[in-house]
C-alpha cells in the first residue's frame, strides 16, 4: 500500500508545472557608450521565480483573476490568493478627511523638493554618469520602504506613498537632464542673422556730364545766353461770346465777307428781286419715264467752279431758288450765318455771307409765292424773312422759351406752321403785326424735328419725332391733348426727317438712325399708311457730320435723293420701290454731303457738308 501511495504521489508531482528560473542579469559596464543624455543603470540583484498558472478573465468589471479548480494547483496557489485579497482590501479603504489633508500636504512638499532639486542641479552643472540613479526591483516591489521626506506621512497607504515617491524620482530625473542649460547653450550658438537689405548704389556723377537741351524760349534767354526782360502782365479779359444774341427787330443785309460792296450788293439784290417766279408747266405735264430721268441725271457733273465755301461752320440747311434764269443757292450754318451764292456770276464777288441769327439755322426755304423772300429758322428762337427788295431781315416770329426746330407753309406763304423741340406747334401769321404766334398747340410727341405740310390737302401735315412719325389734321389741333390721325411706329431708333412727296403727296419718305429709309403710301390718309419699301442705307454719320435727310425730287416724284457714307463720296438717287436709280459723284466731291436741295424744274442739285462748302451738280453749258 505504501508503495502504491508513493507511486501516485510521484505521478502527481510529475504533473505539476515546471519551475522557470530566471538568471541574474547585469549590464556590461565595460562597453564605451557616448550619449547626450545621462546613462541610467539598472541592477537586478534578486532571482525572480515566475509560476505560470491557467486562469480566465470572467469578470472584467472587478478585474478579479479566477483560478481554475485544478486539484494539482489548488494547494500551491493559496498563498498568492491571500496576498491579492489583502491588497484589494487595502486599496478599497476610504481615506478620512485627515488622510486627504496629509496627501495634499505630501504632494506640495514633493513638488517643492523637486523644484529645489532641479534648481540645484542647474547650479552645480552636469553630473557624472556614476552619480546616476540606481533602481532596484526590491525598492519597486516593496510598499513598506521608507523614503526621506515622507516620515510625516506614515498614515498614508502604501499606494499613496509609492505615487509620491515616483513623482520625486521623475522630478530628479528631469533635473538631471539639464534642459535649461542646454537651451541656453543652443541660444548662444545661434547667431542672429541680419536682414538682407538691398542697398542701391548711387551712380557716380560724371564731372563733364552734358545736360539735356532745353528751350531757350521757355527759359526766356536769347541765343547769347542773356536773360530777357520779364514780359508785362496783361489783365485777363473776359472772353466774349462767339455768337452773341442779336437784338430783336429787323436787321440790315450787311455782308460779312466784303468790305465795300454796297453797289455790288444793291445790284445783286435788285437782280434777285426781279427774278420771275418759275413756271410749273413741266411739272403739270406729268412725270417723265425712269429711263429719261436717269439719262438726265447722268448729264449732271461737278467741277471746281461749282464748289465753294460759303459759311464759316458746318452747313445745317440748304435751299435752291426756283428761278429758271439764274442759279442761286442759299445755305444756313450752325454758327447762325446765311450764305448766298449766285453761280451765274463767275467772279469771287458772287457770294455773300450774312449774320441773320446767332445760333444753328435748322430750316431754310424760299417763299413759294414770292421768291424774293428767304425765310430762315434758328435755335435762337427767331424766324426771319430776308427781303431782297428792301435788303432787310425782318423778324417774323420770336419764342426764346420754346426753341423752334422746323417750319412749313400752310395755305399760302403768309401762314406758317412752326414745330418746337419740346413737342409744341405754333401757328404764325406774317400779316399780323408783332412777333408772336396766333395759336399754340400741344402735340403727342416729346420732340419735333421736322414739319411738312401735304402739297394738296393743306390741312394735313406730318411730323418726325424721336421714334414715331405722326400725321395730324390742323383743323382738330387743341391746346392740350392733340391726338394724331395716323402713327407710324415701324421705326426703332431716332428719326431725322419725314416728308410728303412734293407734287401729289402720295408718298412719305422717312430717314431713321437704324440705317433704313422707309417709304409709306399716303394716297389715302386713313387710319394707317401702308409701308411700301424699306431700303438699307448707312445713316450713321457720327458726331461731326450733319444727319442725313432724304428729300423728294419734284421733277420725278417717285424718286428721292439722300447723302451717302460710301467711297468714293457720292449722292444717291433711289426709286420708291427701293431700287438705286443713279449715283452722283466726281473728283471734286471728296467729302460727305449730308444735306441736299433739288431745283423744282431744272436738273440742279446742291449738297452741303460739315466744313461749310456747297457742292453743286448741274448740266454743263455748251
Curated annotation (Swiss-Prot):
<feature type="repeat" description="WD 7">
    <location>
        <begin position="587"/>
        <end position="622"/>
    </location>
</feature>
<feature type="repeat" description="WD 1">
    <location>
        <begin position="310"/>
        <end position="351"/>
    </location>
</feature>
<feature type="repeat" description="WD 3">
    <location>
        <begin position="400"/>
        <end position="438"/>
    </location>
</feature>
<feature type="repeat" description="WD 6">
    <location>
        <begin position="540"/>
        <end position="584"/>
    </location>
</feature>
<feature type="repeat" description="WD 5">
    <location>
        <begin position="490"/>
        <end position="530"/>
    </location>
</feature>
<feature type="repeat" description="WD 4">
    <location>
        <begin position="443"/>
        <end position="482"/>
    </location>
</feature>
<feature type="region of interest" description="Disordered">
    <location>
        <begin position="189"/>
        <end position="209"/>
    </location>
</feature>
<feature type="compositionally biased region" description="Basic residues">
    <location>
        <begin position="80"/>
        <end position="94"/>
    </location>
</feature>
<dbReference type="GO" id="GO:0000792">
    <property type="term" value="C:heterochromatin"/>
</dbReference>
<dbReference type="Pfam" id="PF00400">
    <property type="entry name" value="WD40"/>
</dbReference>
<dbReference type="GO" id="GO:0006974">
    <property type="term" value="P:DNA damage response"/>
</dbReference>
<dbReference type="GO" id="GO:0090734">
    <property type="term" value="C:site of DNA damage"/>
</dbReference>
<keyword id="KW-0853">WD repeat</keyword>
<dbReference type="InterPro" id="IPR001680">
    <property type="entry name" value="WD40_rpt"/>
</dbReference>
<dbReference type="InterPro" id="IPR050853">
    <property type="entry name" value="WD_repeat_DNA-damage-binding"/>
</dbReference>
<comment type="similarity">
    <text>Belongs to the WD repeat DDB2/WDR76 family.</text>
</comment>
<feature type="repeat" description="WD 2">
    <location>
        <begin position="356"/>
        <end position="398"/>
    </location>
</feature>
<feature type="region of interest" description="Disordered">
    <location>
        <begin position="75"/>
        <end position="94"/>
    </location>
</feature>
<dbReference type="GO" id="GO:0019899">
    <property type="term" value="F:enzyme binding"/>
</dbReference>
<feature type="region of interest" description="Disordered">
    <location>
        <begin position="120"/>
        <end position="155"/>
    </location>
</feature>
<comment type="subunit">
    <text>Interacts with CUL4A and/or CUL4B.</text>
</comment>
<protein>
    <recommendedName>
        <fullName>WD repeat-containing protein 76</fullName>
    </recommendedName>
</protein>
<dbReference type="InterPro" id="IPR036322">
    <property type="entry name" value="WD40_repeat_dom_sf"/>
</dbReference>
<dbReference type="GO" id="GO:0005634">
    <property type="term" value="C:nucleus"/>
</dbReference>
<keyword id="KW-0677">Repeat</keyword>
<dbReference type="InterPro" id="IPR015943">
    <property type="entry name" value="WD40/YVTN_repeat-like_dom_sf"/>
</dbReference>
<comment type="function">
    <text>Specifically binds 5-hydroxymethylcytosine (5hmC), suggesting that it acts as a specific reader of 5hmC.</text>
</comment>
